[in-house]
Amino acid sequence: MKEDKLTQLQDEIGYHFQNLSLLNNALTHSSYANERHWKYERNNERLEFLGDAVLELVSSDYIFSNHKDMVEGKMTKLRASLVCEMSLASSAREIKLGEYLKLGHGEWVTGGGKRDSILSDAFEAVIGAIYLDGGLNPAREFILQYVLSDIEKKQLFYDSKTILQEIIQSKFHEKTNLSYALEKEEGPDHNKIGRAHV
C-alpha cells in the first residue's frame, strides 16, 4: 500500500508506526496474500490472534477497574458485548478501515471491505500491530478511544441480543444460533441508533 494512504490511516487512528510493515500486514486479508502466493506472515491472521488477546486483557482490566460492584457473570457479558463482531466492525467503520484493506479480487467484488467479519478481524489485527510496534500503552489508548468509549450503547446492543436469544430458545427449547448483520446506523457518533437483521 502506498505510504501516503498509510499515513492517512495513521492520522485517522492517532498512532504512527515505527514499523510500517506491521500496519501493512494488519490491512492484508488472507485472500489478497493467497492470490500472490505470499507466506502466512504477510496477512493479518496472526496479528488478529494477538490483537484479540490484547483486546480481551484491556477490556477486562477496564471493566474490572471501572465497575467495582459488578459480579463476574455480568462482567463477562459486558466484555462480550464490547468485543463482539458487530461492535468491532462498527469501530472499524468509525476509522474507515474498510477503505484501507487489501482484499483478494473475489472478496473485493463481493463487498468484503464492508463485511462485519472482515472488518472486525482487521480491527483486531490493527490492535495487534500497535501492540507489537509500541507496546501495551498505545494499544490500550487505541482500545479506550475506539472500543470502550461508547460502552453504554454496546452494552444495550448486547442486552437486546441476549433477550432475543433467550426468547427464541424458550420457544424452541433448544440452542439456536442466530447471526446479526448491521443494516443501518444513524445519529451522531456519541449516540448512534442501529438496525440489525437477524
Residue ranges and their predicted role:
Residues 1-197:
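Double-stranded RNA-binding/processing signature
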